[in-house]
Amino acid sequence: MTRHGKNCTAGAVYTYYEKKKDTVASGYGTQTVRLSKDAVKDFDCCCLSLQPCKDPVVTSDGYIYEKESILEYILHQKKEIARQMKAYEKQKNSKKAEMEELNKAAKESKMKAFLDKEMTIVSKPLNPFTRKSDSGIDAAEPSCSQQSSEEKNKQLPSFWIPSLTPEAKTSLVKKPDKTVYCPMSGRPLKMKDLMPVNFTRVDEKVDRVGLINRQDRYVCAVTRDMLGNSVPCAVLRPSGAVVTMECVEKLIKKDMIDPISGDKLSERDIIMLQRGGTGFSGSGVLLQAKEARPVMQA
């Protein structure tokens, strides 16, 4: 292959490399990016505010939140559900009123047709073998097709008004789900499921402001090992203490007793924390972000 042949600017085949390059440049298709360490939160940071927690709580799935942030999130979701429920009830009542109006109009039209038929004077006896139009009863009345065509002409679409275009359809409000879901796991979330977390500081003399500036802030409550994104750790439900998974496997699971409070433990009481990751692919954390965008098909 010659030197200019490597450019491949006049090839007859649209290669996979060229397709991926054009996808990134044009913005079409699924965009994928590899996250670096700067885009990964620390293990003790809130999943909503991405800041070190002052009053941390943890869910049963191991996601840490600031208590104030998660309570504000739950309150906001409940207000949004109430707003959607109000709109749904309004739509339901309007449809009910519309059906009542239609039924009332149908009854009135039947009654009017019956009265017109009873009050009509027939000059000659009706012949069952002749059509109704031949008897002269409905000769003066317009036909149903003419009435429907006139009504249809009144409702012709207007292409310059968005709400009157042929493709415009009234959007129906679906009945909202009253359950509040966790923003990270997508599972139902309740306030009673949030458990407080008690981190053990490296130095008890250092205040919270000085602790935030440090990279190593907390240690294991039992072994005093340093905690970080590279160290798998868990929360003990009875005491809320944070310990390393190595301590859980080697020490705690032998007796299944909380070393801080002395309560009996079960497998459900050991909640593994969701770590932020170290930036390496082998840390067990998904480091690839995807965004679905419109696809251009040939």
From Swiss-Prot:
A single Gene Ontology CC term: nucleus
EC number assigned by the record: 2.3.2.27
Subcellular location: Cytoplasm; Nucleus
MF-aspect GO terms: ubiquitin protein ligase activity
Reactions accelerated catalytically: S-ubiquitinyl-[E2 ubiquitin-conjugating enzyme]-L-cysteine + [acceptor protein]-L-lysine = [E2 ubiquitin-conjugating enzyme]-L-cysteine + N(6)-ubiquitinyl-[acceptor protein]-L-lysine
Ranges spanned by the short sequence motif Nuclear localization signal, renumbered to the chain: 78-101
Coiled coil feature spans: none
Pfam family, one: zf-NOSIP
Domain of life: Eukaryota
Chain intervals for the UniProt region annotation (Disordered): 132-156
Keyword Nucleus: yes
Record's keyword terms, sorted: Cytoplasm, Developmental protein, Nucleus, Transferase, Ubl conjugation pathway
Chief place where the protein resides: cytoplasm
Protein family (similarity comment): Belongs to the NOSIP family.
Function recorded in the entry: E3 ubiquitin-protein ligase that is essential for proper development of the forebrain, the eye, and the face. Negatively regulates nitric oxide production by inducing nitric oxide synthase translocation to actin cytoskeleton and inhibiting its enzymatic activity.
Name of the molecule in the record: Nitric oxide synthase-interacting protein
The gene coding this protein: nosip
